[in-house]
A protein has these predicted regions:
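Short, contiguous alpha-helical
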Residues: 17-25, 39-43, 47-50, 60-101, ...
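Short, positively charged and aromatic/hydrophobic N-terminal segments
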Residues: 11-12
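His/Met- and acidic-residue-enriched segments that coordinate or traffic transition-metal cofactors
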Residues: 53
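Helix-adjacent hinge/juxtasegments
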Residues: 88-129
Length: 203
């Protein structure tokens, strides 16, 4: 099957971030080009998640904004555990045993390394799947959904918890990295945020 050798960068933030844990050159070609965007997006979202996690220090891991909120470390743990469940139970990818998921020393950099390490084998797994696999309906908790739906639900779930952590960063008075565009802390030449009616009306 053919690929997309001349495609644009995965995201305009990715193109200015030169320290991506998963470089674009390591992303495999999808067996079905229609689903290349899913493989690209998964790699890009892992990179974005790592960039948010990296803004925390080890001293922040026990911090929470409210007694009923999760701590920073609880959210990092949940990401690793729940992503393994989505991929292993619902999408059928080969995954490590649950007892092997969490890093041994528990520092922020160790969590980031584990996030990227676990994501790596999922990329060729996703890239190898044919259309029938993506469209097949399988059990998902107490309902049934097609695998493409489950995959995108996983992406949204990760984005939800990543957004929680960007709020934590702001409350801790830390810089908030760019995710899908410039922030109050990160800007670059050529960035064009949509904060005006003029920008919203561009064609």
């Amino acid at each position: 099957m053919f690929g997309f050798p001349n495609r644009a960068p995965l995201h305009y933030y990715d193109s200015v971030n030169t320290t991506q844990p998963i470089p674009e050159s390591s992303i495999p070609r999808a067996s079905v080009p229609t689903f290349q965007h899913a493989v690209d997006t998964y790699a890009s979202e892992i990179n974005k998640t790592a960039s948010v996690w990296r803004e925390f220090s080890d001293a922040d891991l026990g911090w929470r904004p409210h007694p009923r909120s999760s701590t920073v470390e609880e959210i990092l743990k949940h990401q690793l555990l729940s992503e393994r469940r989505f991929f292993g139970q619902f999408l059928g990818s080969p995954e490590p045993a649950p007892a092997e998921l969490l890093p041994k020393n528990g520092g922020v950099e160790a969590y980031i390394a584990r996030l990227v390490e676990l994501a790596g084998p999922r990329l060729p797994f996703l890239a190898s799947q044919l259309q029938d696999w993506w469209l097949a309906v399988v059990p998902f908790f107490d309902v049934h959904r097609d695998r493409a739906w489950i995959f995108w639900r996983r992406i949204l779930h990760t984005a939800h918890h990543r957004t929680q952590l960007t709020v934590y960063l702001r409350l801790l008075d830390r810089p908030v990295p760019s995710i899908y565009g410039p922030t109050a802390d990160v800007k670059w030449k050529g960035a064009d945020p949509t904060n005006t009616t003029e920008a919203a009306g561009r064609k």
